[in-house]
């Protein structure tokens, strides 16, 4: 079956530590993306994830929300510890267990118009898997995992050795400010976007925290605002929420600017509570219309 939108990535076991609280919960791009999509009027969406048998309840929870899930077996689940300071844009991480990488055999029957690669660690998707998926779908990716190296449970930022080859196959790429600098060596978003586009990416999404986001596609820049929040409770999964909203709207035919603003409004709602996005399209549209939320 051909799906309209698909996310491939790991549901993780997360420990989230903030100055005022410690929370244990499922996490990872696959979790936050699928949970966000489940709150939208998305049809024909597929989640492909890998979990250890003892953690499969997290996938069952998503299935129970009406999302189709393909579960790939793995000996271990990715396990993360996310520690935030007073500034929610600053995060340190530990990785206490790693899952097996996705392989072509796992994904040969996956068919979708748009496939989002929810990377968490550099080994999640090989260049061969990226090429295979790009041969049958429009690929989107979050660059974060490709820039993360694990040593002694600590996560270190590293450049992506295969970026100039791999990015030829990725249509839409998202990076935050720090990832943008690691990937390109540029601290100015417009310069970074142009360089990423030179490497072959058709649409570049740069999320800039409370400064909003920048989209570059077809030779044009689009400045997307960050809508004000009442309070910032939990930033974990905000980038995944942004991508879910953006790709959902683009799959419906929305413009770059419309999709970006929709995604930004989703993030405003998500930031104000623990866990994944739990809002509605009505609440998103209220923010976009300037109605107090």
Language-model-detected regions and their locations in the chain:
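Conserved N-terminal subdomain of the carbohydrate kinase-like
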Residues: 2, 13-24, 39-118, 123, ...
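Structural detector of well-ordered beta-strand residues that form the stable sheet scaffold
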Residues: 6, 139-142, 205
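Active-site metal-binding loops of divalent metal-dependent hydrolases
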Residues: 10-11, 29, 241
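Short glycine-enriched, charge-decorated loop/helix-capping segments at active-site entrances
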Residues: 20-25, 153-156, 230
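Histidine-anchored nucleotide/phosphate-binding helix
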Residues: 28-39
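Short, conserved phosphate/pyrophosphate- and ester-handling motifs at nucleotide-, phospho-/glycolipid
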Residues: 37, 176, 239
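Conserved beta-alpha-beta core of the PfkB/ribokinase-like small-molecule kinase fold
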Residues: 118-194
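Conserved phosphate-binding/catalytic region of the ribokinase-like
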Residues: 159-164, 189-293
């Amino acid at each position: 079956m051909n799906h309209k939108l698909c996310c491939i990535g790991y549901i993780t076991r997360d420990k989230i530590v903030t100055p005022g609280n410690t929370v244990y919960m499922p996490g990872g791009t696959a979790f936050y993306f699928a949970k966000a999509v489940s709150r939208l009027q998305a049809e024909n969406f597929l989640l492909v994830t890998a979990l250890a048998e003892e953690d499969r309840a997290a996938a069952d929870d998503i299935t129970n929300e009406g999302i189709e899930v393909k579960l790939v077996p793995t000996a271990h689940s990715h396990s993360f510890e996310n520690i935030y300071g007073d500034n929610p844009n600053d995060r340190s991480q530990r990785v206490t267990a790693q899952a097996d990488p996705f392989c072509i055999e796992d994904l040969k029957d996956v068919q979708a118009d748009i496939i989002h690669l929810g990377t968490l660690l550099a080994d999640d998707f090989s260049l061969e898997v990226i090429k295979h998926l790009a041969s049958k779908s429009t690929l989107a990716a979050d660059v974060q995992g490709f820039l993360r190296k694990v040593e002694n449970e600590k996560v270190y930022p590293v450049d992506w050795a295969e970026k100039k080859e791999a990015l030829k196959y990725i249509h839409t790429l998202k990076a935050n400010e720090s990832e943008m600098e690691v990937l390109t060596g540029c601290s100015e978003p417009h310069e970074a976007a142009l360089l990423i586009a030179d490497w072959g990416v058709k649409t570049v999404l740069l999320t800039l925290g409370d400064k909003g986001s920048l989209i570059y596609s077809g030779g044009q820049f689009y400045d997307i605002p960050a809508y004000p929040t009442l309070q910032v409770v939990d930033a974990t999964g905000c980038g995944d929420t942004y991508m879910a909203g953006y790709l959902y709207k683009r799959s419906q035919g929305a413009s770059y600017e419309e999709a970006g603003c929709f995604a930004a409004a989703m993030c405003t709602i998500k930031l104000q509570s623990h866990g994944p996005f739990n809002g509605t399209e009505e609440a998103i549209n209220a923010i976009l219309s300037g109605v107090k939320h």
